[in-house]
Amino acid sequence: MGQSSDEANAPVAGQFALPLSATFGLGDRVRKKSGAAWQGQVVGWYCTKLTPEGYAVESESHPGSVQIYPVAALERVA
């Protein structure tokens, strides 16, 4: 709130690039290794103090639905 749409959508240089040593790239197909099934395409990444490498995955079965997972929870799909 309080930002113009141009300000809210303006990219900030250097803040939103995938890490150089990223396990997965944007568009890679991945699935959860265990627990509730989730398979889809990597559409983003995140990092926190507890999760230095995490990914946003859009479901193949439910387009538009996105879940976030730490890298350790995911594996590449051929």
From Swiss-Prot:
GO biological process: one-carbon metabolic process; response to antibiotic; response to methotrexate; response to xenobiotic stimulus; tetrahydrofolate biosynthetic process
Annotated residues for binding of substrate: I68
Reactions that this protein is recorded to catalyse: (6S)-5,6,7,8-tetrahydrofolate + NADP(+) = 7,8-dihydrofolate + NADPH + H(+)
EC number(s) stated in the UniProt entry for this protein: 1.5.1.3
Signal peptide extent: none
InterPro entries tied to this protein: Dhfr_type_II, Elect_transpt_acc-like_dom_sf, MscS_beta-dom_sf
Presence of keyword Cytoplasm: no
Pathway stated in the Swiss-Prot or TrEMBL entry: Cofactor biosynthesis; tetrahydrofolate biosynthesis; 5,6,7,8-tetrahydrofolate from 7,8-dihydrofolate: step 1/1
One GO molecular-function entry: dihydrofolate reductase activity
UniProt keywords, alphabetically: Antibiotic resistance, Methotrexate resistance, NADP, One-carbon metabolism, Oxidoreductase, Plasmid, Trimethoprim resistance
Protein residues bound to NADP(+): K32, V66, Q67, I68, Y69
Stored NCBIfam families: trim_DfrB
Written domain comment of the UniProt record: The active site is situated at the inner surface of a pore formed by the four subunits.
Function: Key enzyme in folate metabolism. Catalyzes an essential reaction for de novo glycine and purine synthesis, and for DNA precursor synthesis.
Other remarks on this protein: Type II plasmid-specified enzyme is practically insensitive to trimethoprim and methotrexate.
Assembly information from the UniProt record: Homotetramer.
Protein name (Swiss-Prot/TrEMBL): Dihydrofolate reductase type 2
Organism: Escherichia coli
Native organism taxonomy: Bacteria, Pseudomonadati, Pseudomonadota, Gammaproteobacteria, Enterobacterales
